[in-house]
Amino acid sequence: MSRVYDRLESATLLLARAGGIKDRLNGAWRQCLASIEPEDVPRELRLQFLELSQTMQRERPLRGEDAVRATIRKMSNEEAECQSAMIVRMFCRMTRQQELELALPMPASAAVVQLFAAEG
């Protein structure tokens, strides 16, 4: 899961850079997200990731381009912004999930075991 988190973070940072939204989306997808396998994505984000993946490859390419290039070429700037926002929201959701997991208190039985281990 940390690999997916790292990739989403990198994609978000790419999207935050200067430049045209379509160029930034292209870079974020190709450099960070295209190689992620859907089964590696946490279950609560998998459907959203699959939708993004399908959206990014929906257009038929012209000679000399691939489906991603064709799709981004045909996107409006507003649609590219929407897909970019989806990437940022997935990163934020994964960040919140990790924070919740870190904030969970240790079970009382685990604390007792640790105390006994420290005494003995």
Regions found by a protein language model. Name each.
Residues M1-Q31, I87-V88:
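Short terminal alpha-helical segments
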Residues R7-L13, R17, E37-E44, T71-C82:
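Non-transmembrane, amphipathic alpha-helical segments
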Residues A16-G19, D23, E37-P42, F91-M106:
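Long, hydrophobic, amphipathic alpha-helical segments used as structural scaffolds
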Residues G19-D66:
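Amphipathic alpha-helical interaction modules
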Residues R69-G120:
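Amphipathic alpha-helical binding modules
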